[in-house]
């Protein structure tokens, strides 16, 4: 494979949705794992991971925010193999914190690969894990004569991995007829204690499922989709059956459009069945599901859906909306669209390894963190691994599903869950912050009550209350932006000057906030950023945009105030603006290429 360093890149269509909609509970992280027949050696696994990253440099990315969109940027971070230490599919992307978007852990005989959906999809994750497992097994067993093999095309390049296939196959002339979506039945159960992810796995024979599917004249996915809808239906009341059971079924678009991309490239279909108005027999449900798949799984339908998704993203007016506004709209849209589906059924298909490596592998498995009830499956050799995940007590649906499989002559074997005792995320920091906030509120309230009852001649109560509010705002910014000191400094500059403007106005406007505070804070912040970047040895791409913002703020705002004659004593303002101006000139002259790249990344639409 041809190797070349990855560069910064725009997010693909699906990644833009995931970056906006992910949160602490809905992490948009999924796990692909490999169960070996021997205990994992962590040192060898680390060496194998280092080799795998050389093959897939596109994974060494961090998520950054621009003015209009997020983007992915190469970083000098390297993944470190750890023993499994937290709940599966926990959050990988933490706002403002520079972290990789994937993680490799191990537990006993299992190698886990967890990844944020912004980085890749199921196909990309499969290829990464296969390469990792291959490298690991070779390093362990080469002394026994195991030969090195290649799992990827020899002429595959990094550019192939980075292709945005959504854009490649987008055609603005393709349009899909609009369908009115009905609200689907929603699975609602009491949440588990602590809102932890609930994972139940079982294994069945691939040949048994294929044999029965062929007897019925349908594909494996159609067969299992019909059973899944029936399993859900059995838990619905008569009133609930007025709404259809609708499944979201992801579709790998590489089966329709040639692509070697490691980015997201998938679509979905939504088979739904109303068990009140339609025949409830298995034969009728299977027939409907088969016809639905045959109708929807065509190249024309997939192409039209791609065009529909991209048309919204590429709308000239919507593209110019600020990122934060886009995020709010995407989050609202994602919340609303949840009403259109009951559950998710994701078939990752068969994982294939070179024959010489097969004897060392027990099976592969996959599951994901989702706000919905989800069934994921993948196969290896004759083992088909099922994984039900949710944050609700919904074991009845799983029980129904496996019973229906048994009625079709397919036995299942429950997998005993093997997870270490995880480190619960510490809430101590947030508790301290809440106590601090309560004390600040108490002091402000006490000052206001004192002011109302005693009317002191020198209004020290109001000054004290204002000072406490100012201190709380400043420290809150520091707390929530603690992962990024440079962004923290920029926020402190922006909020700090605004607070000073307000104080100046409330005390009779003596102009000290614009004459002194604004230029001094701007230059001080710029200096602090420079020192932080040097001390921490930050790459240019990590600090330059913040220094440009601080210098621009210290130049443009005082300039406007000088022109409007708001500044009474212009000396300090002019010197501050001069320093900021010279800094920007120096950046353009000595860091021109980096300056241009930062502008492209942060202003791309």
Regions found by a protein language model. Give the residues of each.
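Acyl-thioester-dependent acyl-group transfer interface
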Residues: 1-67, 77-103, 234-415
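Non-catalytic, low-complexity flexible loops and terminal extensions
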Residues: 2-13, 102, 110, 119-127, ...
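Central hydrophobic cores of alpha-helical transmembrane segments
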Residues: 226, 489-496, 544-554
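N-terminal topogenic module of multi-pass integral membrane proteins
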Residues: 416-468
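Membrane-helix interface and helix-disruption motif detector
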Residues: 444-466, 481-487, 502-521, 539-542, ...
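Generic alpha-helical transmembrane segments
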Residues: 463-473, 491-503, 514-531, 554, ...
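Hydrophobic alpha-helical membrane segments
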Residues: 521-531, 542-563
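Short, highly charged, low-complexity non-transmembrane loops/tails of multi-pass membrane proteins
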Residues: 595-605
